[in-house]
Amino acid sequence: MWELVTLLGLILAYLFWPRQGSSGTKYPKSLPSLPVVGSLPFLPKSGHMHVNFFKLQKKYGPIYSFRLGSTTTVVIGHHQLARELLIKKGKEFSGRPLTTTVALLSDNGKGIAFADSSATWQLHRRLVLSSFSLFRDGEQKLENIICQELSALCDFLATCDGQVKDLSSSIFMTVVNIICMICFSVSYKEGDMELVTIRRFTTGFVNSLSDDNLVDIFPWLKIFPNKTLEMIRKYTEIRGAMLSKILKECKEKFRSDSVSNLIDLLIQAKVNENNNNSSLDQDSNLFSDKHILTTLGDIFGAGVETSSSVVLWVIAFLLHNPQVKKKIQEEIDHNVGFSRTPTFSDRNHLLMLEATIREVLRIRPVAPILIPHKANTDSSIGEFAIDKDTNVLVNLWALHHNEQEWDRPDQFMPERFLDPTGSQIIVPSSSYLPFGAGPRSCVGEALARQEIFLITAWLLQKFDLEVPEGGQLPSLEGIPKIVFLIDPFKVKITVRPAWKEAQAEGSA
């Protein structure tokens, strides 16, 4: 009996005790660690994780590590080290850890967001990027799609003149429809079941993936009932059922001479692959239905809550800083006027608006901690060795709030992104990576920048958004899920008199 206990103890010690490198190998400083549980007892139990990691930096330095179960995780909180990881050694650290929750969400590592580095991931990512080329010109031009949805949004908000509303649902619908037009050339209306379904699974994933999941540290816990896993499984099934129906419909009407959206591109790639190698089984080939559905699901996950959240953060900070909102509206009035709507090319003239968006992305990054990277091989960051299969976190919050890089980093100061004359956009620090960088950078960065700029410009051209009478300013604390969400808030919507007059003159 005692021999068995001793043997079990030795096995656990071997599996969970921190590894020691060869003589002379220098590893990042580590939090204390215990067998089995690792550093779990020594991590802060309350507060936002990105803030806690930033505080730990002051004790352990800009790169340090901790252990959870048998896994070592390195945290990076300085832009030079982050750029080395993401860009200079991007391929070496392009892997993704396959945790229990991620495996369930991504159908065991398919798609592009959570897939490990592989030929399949590279191909799907390349196709998603190339799909944007379908929307460069003509009626399908990306900007036209965005403006079409913005026209519907503003028409609706005009009917709410003088009312107090939470804008989140309206902005969500606008962004969803832009994504749906890119993915499968469909736009939904308020109340459509598909729109309700999309909201249900995107919100469900954001909430369930952000819990502290012990099952990701100790995978054997999945044999027990787990609320988080049940939620992910439920929303994965809901998403799969909807997207499978759409994929089936798109396959039936697919024409190789009329590829017009992302799902067409993926179907075309599947047809080409089947023609070239029909012996592959359904699940192993690069474009199985499962691969296509997971990639489409990733586009919704990466593209909807992110852009929607940033727009709401911009509005919230402008409510807190009405003098900035006034400057932006004066800028729009002078450079755009009321005879037309803002275009993306106006970004060169609407500098205070562009600076404000950049400042919001700094002070409240979409993802305060980037999705974890994994070392594909033994490597190094700075002067420190990083073993193969080590997880690496980039703490964007630390980069964007470093007092040595930013003047008063906790203060909202859009002017920091303008030159002293206010006539040119500048990047005041290299410690700024709102969309990540390198092989794992956000595939939808260009789309997100257009969406955020145009949505904000259109809203501020046409409406005054103010704190409701007797109401409170929005909380700027935030809710750190997989996306940094803002607490719900309401605004009073007033159609701007100058816009109303211009519309009346135009219809006369």
Swiss-Prot record:
Heme binds at residue 442. This is Steroid 17-alpha-hydroxylase/17,20 lyase. One of its GO terms (cellular component) is endoplasmic reticulum membrane. Regulated predominantly by intracellular cAMP levels. The 17,20-lyase activity is stimulated by cytochrome b5, which acts as an allosteric effector increasing the Vmax of the lyase activity. One of its GO terms (molecular function) is iron ion binding. Its EC number is 1.14.14.19, 1.14.14.32. Gene3D superfamilies: Cytochrome P450. CDD domains: CYP17A1. One of its GO terms (biological process) is glucocorticoid biosynthetic process. It comes from Cavia porcellus.
